[in-house]
């Protein structure tokens, strides 16, 4: 959430910055509400003061033996008027709060202009796509040939956009999780944590999924307003909700593996084949909490940590900075890492790394105590995929496929596969 003060002091400037996203701020309505709020607030303060004055007069009149009935009537009338004014003020403030809750974060100055993913800007490339001397199969056919991927059975069990993995392919999937967690905790300084896969509405509000993106979530049929997590970002980031930590504890870095659940409500007809877009998938998430002046540098290191995984796996990829129209609701700046998929002859997203500034922290009241001033200040939050497990498996199935239908196992994963170097059809 943006600082509400900005809507009172810098409304035109905020509207101009949000336009970079293609977001139109209703400046006229906000100004109307703010003007009304000021008037009604003054009215409430005046009525409160008048009521207090009249209440004191009652005591004096009573002590002097005077008739206090007229004064009592005046106080009752003032109470009624004050109650009515307070209700009006509450309604105005509630509408303002609702509008502000639906306003996305302001973008960093360096975020490029653009409407959608076609306007994202490539920053760098790593690795050279492999040249095949045989006809390349996609991951669905490679996995089927290894008897390790079964979408038909998953469809019978649940429905579309689910997968069953078996045998060596399932072990390879597990190996990726272990490899990523070991790398991030052993080399990058993250603490591994385990969190609930079900969260409440407050948590989803804190990280920005609610109220605007409820249709993307799986809500449980329960009177407690529980949801399946769309990403570990939600429970991990909310660990700091309503907390004030000491400055000396910063930076805080968490690595967490969870399944993720998404309705893909806006993705009808897209990536219907295979594992690219699933309702349930695994991810290793990286979350950081830092001091405000350090978040942009932290974003660069966070992206580097995700890149390390791709480099160790020798998977060609590129890094792009998202344009204004493609940057997520809560983010001020986002990099995507896109891995090379030979069957599609293109790069596909495998990690998204974002700096949220104090946007999430303000919603969550996540703060640290400034060692110099002794006062609490808002943290800056960041997160990124390190990496999406399913899409990494897809990339390995395609980039490491062999002419005879077997699959070479990346060297860094072999220790997690009991030294196995390849997978062949059983």
Swiss-Prot record:
The species this protein was found in: Teredinibacter turnerae (strain ATCC 39867 / T7901)
Annotated positions binding ATP: 262-264, 349-352
Any one Gene Ontology cellular component term annotated for this protein: cytoplasm
Subunit text: Homodimer. The tRNA molecule binds across the dimer.
PROSITE patterns registered for this protein in UniProt: AA_TRNA_LIGASE_II
CDD domains: SerRS_core
Record InterPro entries: aa-tRNA-synt_IIb (IPR002314), aa-tRNA-synth_II (IPR006195), aa-tRNA-synth_II/BPL/LPL (IPR045864), Ser-tRNA-ligase_type_1 (IPR002317), Ser-tRNA-synth_1_N (IPR015866), SerRS_1_N_sf (IPR042103), SerRS_core (IPR033729), tRNA-bd_arm (IPR010978)
Pathway: Aminoacyl-tRNA biosynthesis; selenocysteinyl-tRNA(Sec) biosynthesis; L-seryl-tRNA(Sec) from L-serine and tRNA(Sec): step 1/1
This protein's domain notes: Consists of two distinct domains, a catalytic core and a N-terminal extension that is involved in tRNA binding.
Residues holding L-serine: 231-233, 285, 385
One Gene Ontology term from the biological process aspect of the record: seryl-tRNA aminoacylation
GO molecular function: ATP binding; serine-tRNA ligase activity
Keywords, sorted A to Z: Aminoacyl-tRNA synthetase, ATP-binding, Cytoplasm, Ligase, Nucleotide-binding, Protein biosynthesis
Function according to Swiss-Prot or TrEMBL: Catalyzes the attachment of serine to tRNA(Ser). Is also able to aminoacylate tRNA(Sec) with serine, to form the misacylated tRNA L-seryl-tRNA(Sec), which will be further converted into selenocysteinyl-tRNA(Sec).
NCBIfam families: serS (TIGR00414)
Classification via Pfam families: Seryl_tRNA_N, tRNA-synt_2b
Reactions listed under catalytic activity: tRNA(Ser) + L-serine + ATP = L-seryl-tRNA(Ser) + AMP + diphosphate + H(+); tRNA(Sec) + L-serine + ATP = L-seryl-tRNA(Sec) + AMP + diphosphate + H(+)
Compartment annotation: Cytoplasm
Entry EC number(s): 6.1.1.11
Family named by the database record: Belongs to the class-II aminoacyl-tRNA synthetase family. Type-1 seryl-tRNA synthetase subfamily.
Main location: cytoplasm
Protein name as annotated: Serine--tRNA ligase
Keyword Transmembrane: no
UniProt KW GTP-binding keyword: no
Entry-linked Gene3D superfamilies: Bira Bifunctional Protein, Domain 2 (3.30.930.10), Serine-tRNA synthetase, tRNA binding domain (1.10.287.40)
């Amino acid at each position: 959430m943006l600082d509400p003060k900005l809507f009172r002091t810098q409304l035109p400037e905020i509207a101009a910055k949000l336009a970079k996203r293609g977001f139109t701020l209703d400046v006229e309505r906000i100004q109307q509400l703010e003007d009304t709020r000021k008037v009604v607030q003054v009215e409430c303060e005046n009525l409160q003061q008048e009521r207090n004055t009249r209440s004191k007069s009652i005591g004096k009149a009573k002590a002097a033996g005077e008739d206090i009935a007229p004064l009592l009537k005046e106080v009752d009338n003032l109470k009624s008027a004050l109650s009515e004014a307070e209700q009006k003020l509450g309604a105005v403030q509630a509408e303002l709060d609702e509008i502000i809750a639906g306003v996305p974060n302001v973008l960093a100055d360096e975020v490029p202009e653009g409407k959608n993913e076609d306007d994202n800007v490539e920053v760098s490339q790593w690795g050279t796509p492999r040249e095949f001397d045989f006809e390349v199969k996609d991951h669905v056919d490679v996995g089927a040939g290894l008897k390790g991927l079964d979408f038909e059975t998953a469809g019978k069990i649940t429905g579309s956009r689910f997968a069953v993995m078996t045998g060596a392919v399932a072990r390879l999937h597990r190996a990726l999780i272990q490899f990523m967690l070991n790398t991030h905790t052993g080399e990058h300084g993250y603490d591994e944590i385990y969190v609930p896969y079900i969260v409440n509405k407050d948590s989803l509000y804190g990280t920005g999924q609610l109220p605007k993106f409820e249709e993307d979530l799986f809500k449980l049929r329960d009177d407690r307003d529980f949801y399946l997590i769309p990403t570990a970002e939600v429970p991990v980031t909310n660990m700091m909700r309503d907390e004030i930590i000491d400055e000396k504890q910063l930076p805080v870095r968490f690595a967490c593996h969870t399944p993720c659940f998404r309705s893909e409500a806006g993705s009808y007809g897209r990536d219907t084949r295979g594992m690219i877009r699933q309702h349930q998938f695994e991810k290793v998430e990286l979350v950081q909490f830092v001091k405000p002046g350090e978040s942009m540098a932290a974003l660069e290191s966070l992206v580097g940590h995700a890149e390390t995984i791709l480099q160790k796996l020798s998977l060609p990829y590129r890094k792009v900075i998202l344009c204004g129209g493609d940057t997520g609701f809560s983010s001020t700046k986002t990099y995507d890492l896109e891995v090379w998929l030979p069957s599609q002859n293109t790069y596909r997203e495998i990690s998204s790394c974002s700096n949220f500034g104090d946007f999430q922290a303000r919603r969550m009241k996540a703060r640290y105590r400034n060692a110099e001033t002794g006062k609490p200040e808002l943290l800056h939050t960041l997160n990124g995929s390190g990496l999406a497990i399913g899409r990494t498996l897809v990339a390995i199935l395609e980039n490491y496929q062999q002419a005879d239908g077997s699959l070479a196992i990346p060297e860094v994963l072999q220790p997690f596969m009991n030294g196995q170097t390849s997978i062949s059809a059983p």
